[in-house]
Amino acid sequence: MEAIYLLRRVMEQYRMDQQDLHLIFIDLEKAYDRVPREILWKALEKKGVRVAYIRAIQDMYDRVSTSVRTQGGESDDFPITIGLHQGSTLSPYLFTLILDVLTEQIQEIAPRCMLFADDIVLLGESREELNERLETWRRALETHGFRLSRSKSEYMECKFNKSRRVSNSEVKIGDHIIPQVTQFKYLGSVIQDDGEIEGDVNHRIQAGWMKWRKASGVLCDAKVPIKLKGKFYRTAVRPTILYGTECWAVKSQHETKVGVAEMRMLRWMCGKTRQDKIRNGAIRERVGVAPIVEKMVENRLRWFGHVERRPVDSVVRRVDQMERRQTIRGRGRPKKTIREVIKKDLELNDLDRNMTKDEVLMQNQAAKEEWHGFIDYDGTKESIEEDKFISDVQVSEPDPHENAMHNEHSTWMSCSTLKPNVPRKKRKISASKRFC
């Protein structure tokens, strides 16, 4: 998530400054299969790994053999003397360590250069600059046994400066011209050359429907309890839709599109359609699912809390402090940014960014009580106390503000339910069951 956030924030900054941004997404051919064992041992030694651990890893790769199963039978065993183990939980760490050692002399400060496993992104302000850096990376990696994929590597040009002349040069790996694209799927999130998120919104909805169809045997089965269907949806389908939404500069039209898709899923789970004229709130209460828009707010605030608690010199904090260039703002309304969306979320819920600091909450009891007015934790002790409290209070009509309450586990900066600024004990407790 951090890499996606960095890339979107950099694109927002360049768009505000009206400066062109050039990106190349590099893919390594059979990255795990091309790692020389000698380079692996040297990288471990250079990083100061203990000798005992190095010997343990060497034992894992010593005298490794495999066979190939075909229609004609199984082949004889043959040794494997190169590459990392496929499927091993240790392999991604070893590969990252090797790549870091091989490129430590040419790496630049993020976000100018971003590495995530075998996915490499290089950023530049011109094609010529990008070509120079790409050639440097090619020499550094291909001289050690790796190979940059000519077919899967792609180039994207973000033309935020409409008055700048287009360069005639091409972005190349050696003699091969890298194809230019208008959007690229980076770590599961669709990045567009105009900095917008429409492509990613549509992709998330499609991914959610694909997951929903795979589970339709359960979700559409009339014999399965409706509450179990809701729990299955919250566990398997909704996280697929919400992936990457923390980094969206979301607009109301995007929220509407995602909300409509979710309601279609929930209605089909209940065996209902819009022609049955059942309100959305009744469907949600029956299934036990809160509006996905509120979950998007929760995820944004949770991620905002993680970012704010990071050290000031971390890359996710430095990208927000990039110096603005002195440019003349163009005509029209400025484009919405992630920070503007977060600021609006905080203002609508009377929250302060200082609440993200753990030490502030520990020292300021008033701030802690205020924040707890917006966050519901699903602790066993609190659940028991709330049940006792409900039994002692006269049952009232359902409150629309309580419909967003949920019982999922939350981290500190989660906003699972956004309620008015009312003390906890003075809130009206409804008889309707909590749903999330």
Question: Would you name each region that the model predicts?
Answer:
Residues 1-93:
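Conserved pre-catalytic core of RNA-dependent polymerases
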Residues 2, 6, 98, 133:
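Charged catalytic carboxylate motif
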Residues 51-54, 68-88, 92, 99, ...:
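Short linear motifs embedded in intrinsically disordered, charge-biased segments
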